[in-house]
A protein has these predicted regions:
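N-terminal leader/linker segments that precede catalytic domains of diphosphate-processing enzymes
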Residues: 1-54, 58-113, 123, 143, ...
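Amphipathic alpha-helical blocks and their helix-capping loop/short-beta junctions
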Residues: 118-145
Length: 175
């Protein structure tokens, strides 16, 4: 499964100034299964309430580019220590429709054991889907939306959709 990730760029698109960054945390569990960490945002959040998302957010002073933002946010939201993170590269920046933010997805392998500590304020739930399931085109569905297909994935009774679904599909070569 790690071989499927070889297409990841080593740098973000030149000239793009990201307004946000997310960490796409990937790890191998103790059974040798490759998984991803996703979170569900609480319904009380002012933006993206109830959405399934990667840890991430807007830059703050002192962040060292998109990687610094993604690492800080992942630590704040789910307790991933920066020392556990091996950045593999970047996906193309994603322009979110709802807030027109340019988001840089930072893809990283996370060292285990993974001892997550979700922020009660920012995380309602943590998911650990297997990459092999997310990479299965048969498990995805779509609805026509404007000029595009809005892809979605059933994730333990919740729906992975929108920009996060687009990032997952880009990562796994499904787009």
């Amino acid at each position: 499964m790690w071989d499927q990730l070889r297409h990841i760029d080593t740098f973000p698109e030149p000239g793009e100034k990201p307004q946000a960054a997310v960490l796409i945390p990937i790890y191998e569990d103790d059974q040798g299964v490759i998984r991803m960490v996703l979170t569900k945002r609480p319904d009380t959040m002012p933006t993206h309430a109830g959405h399934i998302a990667f840890p991430g957010g807007r830059p703050e002073p002192g962040d060292d580019g998109p990687v610094g933002t993604a690492l800080r946010e992942a630590h704040e939201e789910v307790g991933i220590e920066p020392e556990q993170v091996d950045v593999l590269g970047f996906l193309e920046p994603i322009d979110t429709v709802e807030f027109t933010l340019m988001v840089v997805p930072v893809v990283a392998r996370i060292a285990t054991p993974l001892d997550l500590v979700p922020s009660e304020r920012e995380v309602a739930r943590v998911y650990h889907p297997r990459l092999v399931d997310l990479a299965d085109p048969e498990q995805w569905a779509f609805v026509p939306w404007q000029a595009w297909k809005a892809w979605y994935f059933d994730l333990e009774g919740d729906t992975l959709w929108g920009a996060t679904a687009h990032m997952v599909r880009l990562l796994l070569g499904l787009n």
